Amino acid sequence: MLKVAALYQFAPLPDFREVREPLRALCVGLSVKGTILLAGEGINGTVAGMPDAIDALAAELQTGTLFSGRLDNLELKFSQASVMPFARLKVRLKKEIVTLGDPATDPTRAVGIYVEPKDWNGLIAAPDTLLIDTRNAFEVAMGTFEGAVDPQLARFGEFKDFVAQKLDPDRHRRIAMFCTGGIRCEKASSYLLSRGFKEVYHLKGGILKYLEGIPESESCWRGECFVFDDRIALGHGLTESRRAGRLMDGAPGDD
């Protein structure tokens, strides 16, 4: 059984271009495959390999010399795959590790309030909480939280238009957001704060961490969670979906 790691952290990485090749060499040496994005604002990726290899990569990212402790708050979600879900390794340089397209939004400076999965149900059950799914529309169609607003995004960059057209800081006093692994909703929370919203929450570790830790009997999640690899979707306990392969024919990009 292979180990899959979804990882990200917003952190200033002014030398992100210089660490690309050493990071690629490390992954090649560990026979790890997947995609890692590097930008001045941090790191984002999903990789797979033998359990010892993934553990070694995670340890190097968090405490090794390559990043010198700058990724000590790396958000990690682990799951399993019966076969390698990636065809190759890609380490890419980007302007943003998740593309919003607003240069003024800086998650390394300010983000909303993290909510642990165990506290999520209580927050979204409150009548004055507006719950927003920050993923693309095709992902929402496969599964989402009960009562969540679907902004009908074709790509994450359209979130800005949704905010301008549908949200108002004076009317929407408490907003809770979620996404697959936490990165999109974290950046969305930073954007909302920059637009004058005061009480902004986001699910720490995203849907994957929630599905990993919350029993299905207590869950407010309905459906399955799309993932951007050959497994297509995961269910409670991060088990591979048996249904999703019949629903999706290939995986689109992760914008």
From Swiss-Prot:
It comes from the Bacteria. It is an enzyme of class 1 (oxidoreductase). HAMAP family: TrhO. CDD domains: RHOD_YceA. Catalyzes oxygen-dependent 5-hydroxyuridine (ho5U) modification at position 34 in tRNAs. The keyword Repeat does not apply. The lineage of its organism: Bacteria, Pseudomonadati, Pseudomonadota, Alphaproteobacteria, Hyphomicrobiales. The active site is at C179 (cysteine persulfide intermediate). One of its GO terms (molecular function) is oxidoreductase activity, acting on paired donors, with incorporation or reduction of molecular oxygen. NCBIfam families: PRK00142.1-4. This is tRNA uridine(34) hydroxylase. It catalyses: uridine(34) in tRNA + AH2 + O2 = 5-hydroxyuridine(34) in tRNA + A + H2O. GO terms for biological process: tRNA modification. It holds the Pfam family UPF0176_N. SUPFAM superfamilies: Rhodanese/Cell cycle control phosphatase. Coiled coil: none annotated. The keyword Ligase does not apply. Its EC number is 1.14.-.-. Keywords: Oxidoreductase, tRNA processing. Residues 125-219 form the Rhodanese domain. InterPro entries: Rhodanese-like_dom, Rhodanese-like_dom_sf, TrhO, TRHO_N. Belongs to the TrhO family.
